[in-house]
Design a protein with these regions (language model features):
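N-terminal leader/targeting segments and the immediate start of mature chains
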Residues: 2-64, 68-73, 142-144, 251-269, ...
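Gly/Pro-enriched, hydrophobic low-complexity segments
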Residues: 146-248
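Flexible, processing/modification-adjacent segments and terminal tails
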Residues: 96-189
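Short, solvent-exposed recognition patches
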Residues: 62, 120-124, 128-130, 258-357
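Short, hydrophobic/aromatic-rich segments at coil-to-beta transitions
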Residues: 44-49, 72-77, 147-154, 182, ...
Length: 385
């Protein structure tokens, strides 16, 4: 569970080293987004102080937090100052691939959330791809943010105003915010518009500030501003920021099913799994990352999930799951034939092949549509028959 990407030997990597000290030539908005996507795809770790302000006509909320991230999922956030009663100063959130801890100092309660089989996704990458593909964008201006030379990009949704729903959800940093487009059930906005300004550090092209403004005609309905201060990339933060021990005496609550175990080797997992584990042939560059054994009672049974990832691209994943209780509906899926297997296909955000062998069911899945799922399924076959 310690896969790390290798920085590509490209111009972006040179930029990360800080070789640019003056504003570069004005780039196009397309170039800004492409450079930013390359940066967030190769950066190893990020540390910053994050200042967030949310303003509406009758109130203003501020949060200041220290953030350490190791993309795509590891993150530590410590709230330094906050006027938001729901997230007070002293609140802590620590997330890894398999677990999230959230500590509330007001109640002295720590919540441990288990998610050992969650697909990895880099929020910054998804946000940048959304800006590139779902917004009309243009270069706005040069600027200075926290003493850094920066380029600002202006973006507006590329769909008609009639398509705007009751609310628009924005991914800002590591948090999803809903900005209402109706003041109340009986008071819809008459002429809503949304405008986003995103600032990119000139030296690294990392996004360091964002402002999202919702207007009704000329009136500002809400404005959200986020700024990264004292930004540092690739400092080698190590494991310590992503480990967490609740304060002594605090109340601990658990959400989600705690796994029987998370194992590095097949032999260790085989000792606790109640059935024979498959031995799939996984193509390179995939390497096994972890094996998760979960027990979910008589109704859902025991599942064992073998996770594989690309060491140079942590978001590129593939997993094989075996279960003693069937969780797919053949009548709702498209059937196919692979060698001697009757498989059922599911398309969508995750591409999946399901099949049944005697008392066990198997699944091969990946969020990437071009992965060799059929070859992996064929290599597993029906080991339980």
């Amino acid at each position: 569970m310690k896969r790390r990407r290798v920085l590509a030997a490209t111009g972006s990597a040179a930029a990360l080293a800080g070789c640019l000290s003056v504003p570069s030539q004005q780039p196009s908005s397309d170039r800004l987004l492409e450079d930013a996507l390359e940066t967030v795809s190769t950066v190893e770790d990020v540390s910053a102080r994050r200042a967030l302000t949310v303003e509406v006509p009758d109130s203003r909320t501020e949060r200041v937090a220290d953030v350490t991230k190791r993309p795509p999922t590891d993150r530590r956030l410590e709230m330094v100052d906050s006027s938001d009663l729901s997230v007070p100063a002293g609140a802590v959130s620590v997330r890894t691939t398999t677990t999230t801890w959230e500590y509330d100092p007001e109640t002295d309660t720590a919540i441990e959330r288990h998610h050992p089989n969650r697909i990895l996704a880099d929020v910054n990458r998804l946000t940048l791809e959304s800006l590139r593909e779902e917004y009309d964008h243009s270069y706005s201006r040069t600027d200075t943010v926290d003493g850094r030379d920066a380029h600002a990009l202006l973006a507006k949704p590329d769909h008609d105003e009639d398509e705007l729903t009751r609310s628009i959800e924005f991914l800002v940093g590591e948090t999803a915010y809903q900005i209402p487009l109706e003041r109340s059930d009986d008071d819809a906005l008459e002429d809503p518009t949304v405008e986003r300004l995103v600032w990119f550090d000139d030296a690294t092209r990392y996004p360091i500030k964002e402002r999202t403004t919702v207007r009704d005609g000329e009136a500002v309905v809400s404005e959200l501003t986020l700024t990264y201060e004292d930004l540092s990339l690739d400092d080698g933060v190590g494991e310590e920021p992503f480990t967490y021990e609740p304060p002594a005496g605090s109340t601990i609550e658990t959400v989600g099913t705690e796994p029987v175990g998370i194992y590095d080797s097949r032999a260790e997992a085989a000792e606790v799994a109640p059935y024979e584990l498959p031995e799939p042939e996984i193509p390179g560059p995939f390497e096994r990352d972890r094996i998760v054994v979960l027990e979910k009672g008589d109704e859902l049974g025991t599942s064992t999930t073998l996770w594989y990832g690309d060491p140079d691209d942590p978001e590129r994943e593939l997993f094989v799951a075996v279960r003693d209780e069937q969780r797919f509906d053949p009548d709702a899926l498209e059937g196919d034939r692979i060698d001697d297997l009757d498989v059922y296909c599911r398309d969508g955000r995750i591409q999946t092949l399901f099949w049944r062998c005697a008392e066990l069911t198997y699944e091969v899945s990946s969020p990437y549509s071009d992965e060799p799922l059929e070859e992996v399924a064929s290599s597993i076959g029906c080991p339980s028959v």
